[in-house]
A protein has these predicted regions:
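FIC/Doc superfamily catalytic core
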Residues: 1-241
């Protein structure tokens, strides 16, 4: 039991570290563990990101454990609100779907636009359709494939001004959890993505204008990569037990 507690503690720290690192947070894992342990009062944004993500992770984990998790628009917005709390200037962007356009830049060539997501006026409709699709297919579509579909589609819709990736990764873990693959305690698939961030972005992202490519987006490559990530992480855990 002590070993399981240690694994759970380590997995949460690793998930938090990896997910914020993917988005550019420079703090090493040792610093992340220190922030989570000591919870300092006067903190920088890089530390705030860590505490926010960990809080959201704990909230979602608790919902899954108690059987209280259900994917809804309100929950998605709530989780984003926790993730970006005190990190955004405009309160309208916290815990609410975006009402402004966004552009996704190529992380390797920052002056190059990689993707133009859907118009803000369509976000509510697109997210409603995604939530309905996921909930209506629980038990019908393989849970790993269903979680992978949610992950990529939510990234494509890009419903928030900021915090999309972190929110998506948290909810993906929860979707796996309610479908019998409860990974919170020992598992961090974010760790797999963080080992090669460029590959993750290339697999989960799409390139171009949403309205020009939306009918031709292929999820197959991403789903295969997603499954490889779960397998890779399970192998890592096996070595630590």
């Amino acid at each position: 039991e002590q070993n399981l507690v240690r694994l759970e503690h380590d997995a949460r720290a690793l998930s938090t570290y990896a997910s914020v690192s993917i988005e550019g947070n420079p703090l090493p894992l040792t610093d992340v563990k220190s922030v989570l342990k000591n919870r300092p009062n006067n903190i920088r944004d890089t530390q705030r990101e860590i505490l926010n993500y960990n809080q959201a992770l704990e909230e979602i984990s608790q919902k899954v454990k108690t059987g209280d998790f259900q994917l809804t628009d309100d929950l998605i917005a709530r989780i984003q609100g926790v993730v970006v709390n005190d990190l955004m200037e405009d309160e309208e962007d916290i815990g609410k779907y975006r009402k402004k356009p966004v552009i996704i830049r190529n992380p390797e060539k920052i002056d190059e636009i990689a993707f133009l997501p859907p118009d803000a006026k369509e976000i509510v409709s697109l997210m409603s359709s995604l939530v309905k699709f996921i909930n209506s297919n629980i038990g019908l579509i393989d849970p790993i494939i269903l979680a992978a579909i949610f992950h990529k589609q939510n990234v494509i819709i890009h419903p928030f001004m900021d915090g999309n990736g972190r929110t998506t990764r948290l909810l993906t873990t929860a979707l796996l959890g309610i479908n019998g693959i409860d990974l919170f305690e020992i598992f961090s698939f974010e760790n797999y993505y963080n080992q090669n961030v460029t590959k993750y972005f290339n697999k989960v992202g799409v390139f171009g204008d949403y309205y020009e490519i939306k009918d031709d987006i292929d999820f197959t490559d991403w789903i295969e990569y997603f499954m490889e990530g779960i397998l890779d992480e399970l192998k890592r855990i096996q070595k630590t037990i």
